[in-house]
């Protein structure tokens, strides 16, 4: 891991270098995705079947071979162990409870001239959620993407999940059952994103696509944005821990590992105010790494993008955190709620020594789909509001037509838009 000290004259340069991440799009990936999207848009189901058989090594004869029914999802739920059933239900219940509180409601008011103004909230009609498939599958992603849509009142939630070599993951399908997914198609990659965006003979066009995927999925989401909405194009996973030295070093070490084990370009950063404590955490990491099944990935991640930063105090640590704008921020300090008030930019803030980031990944309640790559400066977590729309309401009274008409007429003439002005003037006495 890199070692940085805020008192060093080259600290800012070192921090910028640490956060630099090459996000340039691969031209070859973009070309392949463009061809796939165009083909699916043109040939529909036939293209989808061909690409699925080619990339996932399946042997689908027709689109019916790629459809899972509610009965299939229920059967998957019944096949998994009881403790896993309970865990899925507990996580879904907590995520649902949290996202209920995010639900936007319609409102209106009448101003002094009798004009009614307001905002009408409606859910999206149909959404698609992309879920990675195969052995390394993530049922938590199903819950985090589907449940907010369910709470928002979306009538149709369509899930696509690849099944390489026909391998289905029962826990993922069980999560879909618990989270209220309407339909499931066993397709993945750019072809699945294109099918959701453009529609095929069998897969209906959705209004928005959410969920994580590989570089091809990300490129496809970028390409279809505008035809449909998307949640975000996520970068590598990130964690920043601010520690005051009161949390056991082993706990902090494992929290850093929890993000580093995602992949070699994930980022784990620790900011401390004591060199002795940073050394203690480093020693704990050296000891605990021996027990990690994904040791190679963790070591590569920490070597590539990990860091320990020595700050002069917690105020400075918080300012650094605001600059980094991390996906996950742990405030492993005393009085964490007070320090949280100093944080302006973070996807999720985990307060106190007992609030490990992994609890938020699975079952605390808030969404784990979070802005990465410093986009927390202007972006927010996935939520119920992402599956709702706002429409403005305006009902002008006869009296209001006089008052507003005068203003609109003057402004319209100022813009040389005569018809606009006349439309307002016709309603004036």
Curated annotation (Swiss-Prot):
EC number: 1.1.1.23
Catalytic activity, reaction form: L-histidinol + 2 NAD(+) + H2O = L-histidine + 2 NADH + 3 H(+)
Cellular component aspect of the GO annotation: cytosol
PANTHER family, sorted: HISTIDINE BIOSYNTHESIS TRIFUNCTIONAL PROTEIN, HISTIDINOL DEHYDROGENASE HDH
One Pfam family, short name: Histidinol_dh
Gene3D superfamilies tied to this protein: 1.20.5.1300, Nitrogenase molybdenum iron protein domain
Cofactors: Zn(2+)
Keywords: Amino-acid biosynthesis, Histidine biosynthesis, Metal-binding, NAD, Oxidoreductase, Zinc
HAMAP family: HisD
NCBIfam families (alphabetical): hisD
Family statement drawn from the similarity comment of this UniProt entry: Belongs to the histidinol dehydrogenase family.
Domain of life: Bacteria
Active site: 327-328
Binding site for Zn(2+): 259, 262, 361, 420
Name of the featured protein: Histidinol dehydrogenase
GO molecular function term, any single one: zinc ion binding
Organism field: Neisseria meningitidis serogroup A / serotype 4A (strain DSM 15465 / Z2491)
Binding site for NAD(+): 130, 191, 214
Gene name of the record: hisD
Keyword Oxidoreductase listed: yes
CC cofactor note: Binds 1 zinc ion per subunit.
Function according to Swiss-Prot or TrEMBL: Catalyzes the sequential NAD-dependent oxidations of L-histidinol to L-histidinaldehyde and then to L-histidine.
Residues holding substrate: 237, 259, 262, 328, 361, 415, 420
Pathway(s) annotated for this protein in UniProt: Amino-acid biosynthesis; L-histidine biosynthesis; L-histidine from 5-phospho-alpha-D-ribose 1-diphosphate: step 9/9
């Amino acid at each position: 891991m890199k070692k940085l000290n805020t008192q060093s004259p080259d600290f800012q340069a070192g921090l910028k270098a640490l956060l630099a991440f090459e996000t340039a799009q691969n031209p070859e990936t973009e070309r392949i995705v463009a061809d796939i999207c165009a083909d699916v848009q043109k040939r529909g189901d036939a293209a989808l079947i061909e690409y699925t058989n080619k990339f996932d090594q399946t042997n689908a004869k027709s689109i019916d071979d790629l459809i899972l029914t509610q009965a299939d999802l229920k059967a998957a739920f019944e096949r998994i162990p009881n403790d896993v059933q309970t865990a899925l239900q507990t996580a879904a219940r907590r995520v649902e409870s949290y996202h209920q509180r995010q639900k936007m409601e319609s409102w209106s008011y009448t101003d002094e001239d009798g004009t009614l103004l307001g905002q009408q909230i409606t859910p999206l009609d149909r959404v698609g959620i992309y879920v990675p498939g195969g052995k390394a599958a993530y049922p938590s992603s199903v819950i985090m993407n589907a449940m907010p849509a369910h709470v928002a009142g979306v009538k149709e939630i369509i899930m696509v999940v690849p099944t390489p070599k026909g391998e289905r993951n029962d826990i993922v399908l069980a999560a879909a059952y618990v989270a209220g997914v309407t339909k499931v198609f066993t397709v993945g990659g750019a072809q699945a994103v294109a099918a959701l965006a453009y529609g095929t003979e069998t897969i209906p066009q959705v209004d928005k696509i959410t969920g994580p995927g590989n570089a091809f999925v990300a490129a496809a989401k970028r390409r279809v944005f505008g035809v449909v909405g998307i949640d975000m194009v996520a970068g590598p996973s990130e964690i920043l821990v601010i520690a005051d030295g009161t949390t056991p070093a082993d706990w902090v070490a494992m929290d850093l590992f929890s993000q580093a084990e995602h992949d070699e370009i994930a980022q784990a950063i620790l900011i401390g105010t004591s060199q002795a404590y940073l050394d203690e955490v480093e020693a704990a990491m050296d000891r605990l790494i021996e027990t990690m099944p994904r040791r190679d990935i963790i070591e590569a991640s920490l070597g590539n993008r990990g860091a320990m930063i020595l700050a002069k105090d917690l105020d400075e640590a918080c300012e650094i955190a605001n600059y980094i704008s991390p996906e996950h921020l742990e405030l492993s300090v005393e009085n964490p709620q007070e320090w949280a008030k100093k944080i302006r930019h973070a996807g999720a803030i985990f307060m106190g020594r007992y609030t490990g980031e992994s609890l938020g990944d699975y079952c605390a309640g808030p969404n784990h789909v979070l802005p990465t790559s410093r986009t927390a400066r202007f972006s927010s977590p996935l939520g119920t509001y992402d599956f709702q729309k706002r429409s403005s309401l305006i009902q002008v009274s006869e009296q209001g037509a006089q008052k507003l008409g005068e203003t609109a007429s003057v402004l319209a003439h100022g813009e040389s838009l005569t018809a606009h002005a006349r439309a307002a003037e016709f309603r004036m006495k």
